[in-house]
Swiss-Prot record:
Regulated by guanine nucleotide exchange factors (GEFs) including DENND3 which promote the exchange of bound GDP for free GTP. Regulated by GTPase activating proteins (GAPs) which increase the GTP hydrolysis activity. Inhibited by GDP dissociation inhibitors (GDIs). Gene3D superfamilies: P-loop containing nucleotide triphosphate hydrolases (3.40.50.300). Belongs to the small GTPase superfamily. Rab family. PANTHER family: LD44762P. One of its GO terms (biological process) is autophagy. Mg(2+) binds at T20, T38, D61. This is Ras-related protein Rab-12.
Amino acid sequence: RPADFKLQVIIIGSRGVGKTSLMERFTDDTFCEACKSTVGVDFKIKTVELRGKKIRLQIWDTAGQERFNSITSAYYRSAKGIILVYDITKKETFDDLPKWMKMIDKYASEDAELLLVGNKLDCETDREITRQQGEKFAHEITGMRFCEASAKDNFNVDEIFLKLVDDILKKMPLDILRNELSNSILSLQPEPEIPPELPPPRPHVRCC
């Protein structure tokens, strides 16, 4: 049967944190040891069933390099869920989180669900960021969840996406979901302005 709803999720974070690996593990159950850096925006689609509903999930994988920010910023606007990823073995990717929160504050809708993910848990012996540091950062952001994962070992990957989708469904009445998300969302051409039917940009929130 056709999907009941269509949802957009965007994955953001610094270069090399494993955004593409998380997406491909979830959608295709594959893992690439030496994935090429994403140029601009890539996407995959996966259909999931939650709460008795069939949901077509479009996942946008964004480039982490600053030179692509002008391209990727347009995709924040209609995303109902945002996954912010850092590498637990690279402190600089954790230090970049406030920068990414500024992008969220500026471009994302106010009702977007937020999830912070510490990736590469398979490299525990090389850890530079403790779980407590990740939890503390997420705790200081209103409504942000936190978890650690490993795309390589397929640990917590499904849980990341399914929990995010479940949070979106719980937050939005079904009639609103049906009205807002029934239109086709498969075009990857960003609009230069926020469409009038979308929520306003997310107001500034405390990020650190």
